[in-house]
Amino acid sequence: MNRFPFGLRPSQEAILRFRGGKMGVAAVPGAGKTYVLSALAAHLIAEKRLEPHQEILIVTLTNSAVENFSTRIAQHLRTLGLLPRLGYRVRTLHGLAHDIVREKPEKVGLDERFTILDEFEAGRILREVAMQWLMQHPEFIENYMGELNAEREREARREYFPAAVEKLALAFIRTAKDLRLTPERLRERLENQPQSLPLVEMGCEIYAEYQRVLNYRGGVDFDDLVRLALDLLESDPGYLKRLQDRWPFVLEDEAQDSSRSQEALLRLIVGDVSPSSGRGWVRVGDPNQAIYETFTTANPYLLRRFIAEEADERPTLSESGRSQPGIVALANRLIQWVMQEHPLPEARDALQPPFIRPLSEEPLTPLTGWGFQAIYLQSKRYAPEEEVKEVVRSLKRWLPQNPDRTVAVLVTDNRRGGHFMEALRQAGLPAVELLRTSQTTRTAASLLAEALEWLEQPTNAKSFSEVYQKVWRRSEEKEERVKAAAGWLRHCDVIAYLSPFPAESDLEEQFAGLPPEVQDELRAFRQVARRWQALTLLPVDQLILTLAPDLFTTAAELALAHKIARALAQIAGQHPDWQLPDLIRELRLIAENERRFLSPGMEDGFDPEAYKGKVVVATIHKAKGLEWDRVYVTSVSNYEFPSGEEGDTFRSEEWFVRDGLSLQAEMLEQLNCLLHPEEYHVYEEGVASRRARVDYVRERLRLLYVAITRARRELIITWNHGRRKTNIQALPFAVLKEWLEQMKKQGGSERA
């Protein structure tokens, strides 16, 4: 009889033999990490390894994973004949830190009623502080501006440098908090630093003001929570000992995404453990799926080092039942090529074993039905819009024949995802999205922004015409009468047209030569536009609510307009100095998928199985942890997935910054010089940017690996030449394409 009644694979059973000490587990995609960790928790409870007051602590990355773990553990406990809700606690790392701080907030200088600012509000405060800093330090732009023509330079000053400063400030503050550095400690070090470190100066000044605003509001952000929890436990040994006694076993999921401070917090709670101590720390993760390093403080090398140097046990979860053997073989080939043949030797550690082992050990042949023949790497050189059209055409053929299958289109950024969603909508194909904001939200925000922009500049005839055709008559914008009316409005005298006292004869004179149906359109829109103009003195929320019935027809659209109005009213209240253009800018950021709005959306607890027969459009980052029968991976060019070869470009190197510098890499290098002068003697500009290229290459290789391993049955990979027509196939795309063709010619006789 199986001593583990959970239906486990052999590699999973090895983990359930854990009794104490430190265990580090490298897991492949589809290895069942959640299943085996929840089974281990249930098994430790069943073996009565806990005192009545003790719990097993399970720490994971997302709120949806918390719910998933809780459900799984309860099911396992029922299988073992035990009560389903006793003996364990499941928390996110930030949730755990919040629990710790909430018990004794006064110990870390917080009021007992302290609040946690969500991502949206914390981002808004940071944006305002960063913009104030940039206005006070115009020399920053001069110091880093590249050689541009006059028009591009104006664009960079107006849009791109402000966004860059905000992004830099966020990276600096997150890093400083992960290192547990306060603005005061940083300032003290800077005053004793002989070198010029301008990017650290910038980061420190913005950090200090940002933190001052948070303190004034009695709030903390998510990055504060872990730092404060560490401070509290280090300053209160009795409290720490109580938590260590409460949680003798700590099981950590997605450990490849932990940061230094997060690892330190768990290390404190775990305390001294050995295989015979009756206490334990299990860390499970897949360093090959570490795809957040460049824009968070996540550090996948922490898990690798733990497994190699600290762990008492090092089992691997290498068996996967997710993907068919051909896709497994393709993913393994990518790992092998990166390790042995990547042109950048420094990037060859981006992907490491374990290789994926399919549950079926049968050789791949055309007769097995699901092998290499279900993988397509399209070598055709598409324009960006042609790639979208080709994928949509393919889906139009596939969806009717596969109503009970799941399918996803994976993109590299939210804006590209918006293009696919619009094309799917126009093609009449059912689609859902895992992007920063939904298409419905983006459309509503865009329409409202168009209307408000005209009200801000009411004499602008071009804007006036756009509002008429693209907003008020958007469902009929291609009809001849609408196009004719829009053409007339584009060149009209807006003041004369909207004047409240023209005689009918004056209107007829203005409309002379226009068909009657066009004149009727212009008279109708004149009434609407005049009514809108009368609303401009209203507060922004009342203005939007009054405009909404003229712009939207469905209950869902009107409800969304109400939410937008409420959100903008809150923003206006927090920023009484803001004018209408500032609020319009916020709407534009939502419309362009650059700003998350209202709530995290469907990705929390998203289940692809609930959307059979529909197309899911997702960024690769949002797709992590999910799987579909058929997957399209798009935009696999050397722009999105560079290999460090000549001609490759890097997103981290902004086009408007001189000398190809990555300002974030340079800033963090300057911070290292400040903190570790014995190791980083002299700051040399450009060195960090070159090193950041390698880091970016590594992360994009892992991102491609994640994308490939989302597919269960069929995989299609495409690429495009970009707006400037200079992109080529990503090098790993070309390598995998050549290898795949060889496999198909050989009849697929290789084992996965």
Tell me the role of every PLM-derived stretch.
Residues 4-35, 57-58, 89, 117-122, ...:
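Conserved helicase NTPase motor core
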Residues 51-54, 77-87, 104-118, 130-143, ...:
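Short, polar/flexible loop-turn hinges at active-site or ligand-entry regions and domain interfaces
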Residues 1-112, 116, 241, 278, ...:
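P-loop NTPase Walker
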Residues 84, 107-201, 205, 314-320, ...:
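ATP-hydrolysis module of ASCE/P-loop NTPase motor domains
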